[in-house]
From Swiss-Prot:
Biased composition (Acidic residues): 1-14
Compartment(s) where it occurs, according to its Swiss-Prot or TrEMBL record: Cytoplasm, Cytosol; Nucleus; Cell projection, Cilium, Photoreceptor outer segment; Photoreceptor inner segment
InterPro entries: Phosducin (IPR001200), Phosducin-like_reg (IPR051499), Phosducin_N_dom_sf (IPR023196), Phosducin_thioredoxin-like_dom (IPR024253), Thioredoxin-like_sf (IPR036249)
SUPFAM superfamilies with a match to the protein in the record: Thioredoxin-like (SSF52833)
PTM characteristics: Light-induced changes in cyclic nucleotide levels modulate the phosphorylation of this protein by cAMP kinase.
Protein name: Phosducin
Protein function: Inhibits the transcriptional activation activity of the cone-rod homeobox CRX. May participate in the regulation of visual phototransduction or in the integration of photoreceptor metabolism.
Family: Belongs to the phosducin family.
Entry GO terms, CC: cytosol; nucleus; photoreceptor inner segment; photoreceptor outer segment
Highest taxon listed in the record's lineage: Eukaryota
Alphabetized Gene3D superfamilies for the sequence: Glutaredoxin (3.40.30.10), Phosducin, domain 2 (1.10.168.10)
One example of a Gene Ontology biological process annotation: visual perception
Signal peptide: none
Amino acid sequence: MEEAKSQSLEEDFEGQATHTGPKGVINDWRKFKLESEDSDSVPPSKKEILRQMSSPQSRDNKDSKERFSRKMSIQEYELIHRDKEDENCLRKYRRQCMQDMHQKLSFGPRYGFVYELETGEQFLETIEKEQKITTIVVHIYEDGIKGCDALNSSFTCLAVEYPMVKFCKIKASNTGARDRFSSDVLPTLLVYKGGELISNFISVSEQFAEEFFAGDVESFLNEYGLLPERETHALDQTNMEEDIE
């Protein structure tokens, strides 16, 4: 049974691959290429080229055959390498998009350090007068409150990593609303954009371990989509993908 099946497969294979030499293999590939093309999606001109490529021996005149072969070599090259050229164009386009985005971000508002707000008026002015595209993250703290020092240190690092985000801090006693920000709710994080409060987290240190660092705060804010993608990370990721391809 197995021998009969094997013999049948061999006969089928031999019936399909009728050419044995190097030129025969090429012609078999050309024929397969033609047969595998979807007749509804292939332009008539391309089908004619592939059909002619599949049987170059049909021409009788030697000079015509040579000219035809040269022509087909060019057409064949174009067909084979068209997809690769499209991939290269796509990579260039993606790289250009990332560079454009990086340039736009570079020319936008940039901060790079933590702003200490001294009064409630300064706090309100920062929120109301900052550009609408800017995300403002405010830490309301008080000296001696657990987690406040660690959060201030984390802000210092994140302000460098995300220069397009404005990181601020203000003591609860300076807000003019001390009764709203008692020690029970500190440290508190408030996030604004376009003059509107978009997120607030009271006693935010409870979200972290006993000891926490900038990376923990970054991950927490990213969970809520409050931080943009880092510029250097976006460009490095694109370059890495291109190197792999």
